[in-house]
């Protein structure tokens, strides 16, 4: 099942290291089937506060996303970003194409006290 590596980059500032990171990241993703879904840009905040921007990278599955993140190639370039940008990174699993939130709501409803 598809998975996503998501990073919230708070107040990113461009510098030579960050540009080098951007230039090199695709080569680290290719062996794991990663592709950018969202790569920064303006965020249209509708609820709450959201300082910064977001990056979303799609992978074939959670194992591929984790293997990419933990790979020596990615770990080598990671400090180029993390030394300059305050961020949070995570991996989440997607839902199947036929996902119906009503089934989830029904399961949760069954857990509620009567």
Say what each PLM segment does.
Residues 1-53, 60-67, 93-114:
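Short S/T/G/P-rich N-terminal loop/turn motif that feeds into the first structured element of a domain
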Residues 63-98:
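A contiguous, mid-protein "functional segment" used to position or interact
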């Amino acid at each position: 099942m598809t998975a996503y590596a998501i990073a919230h980059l708070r107040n990113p500032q461009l510098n030579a290291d960050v540009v080098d990171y951007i230039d090199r990241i695709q080569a680290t993703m290719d062996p794991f089937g990663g592709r950018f879904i969202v790569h920064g840009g303006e965020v249209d905040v509708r609820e709450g506060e959201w300082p910064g921007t977001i990056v979303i990278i799609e992978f074939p599955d959670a194992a591929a996303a984790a293997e990419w993140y933990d790979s020596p190639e990615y770990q080598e370039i990671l400090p180029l970003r993390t030394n300059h940008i305050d961020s949070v990174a995570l991996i989440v699993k997607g839902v199947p194409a036929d996902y119906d939130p009503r089934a989830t709501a029904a399961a949760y409803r069954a857990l509620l006290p009567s």
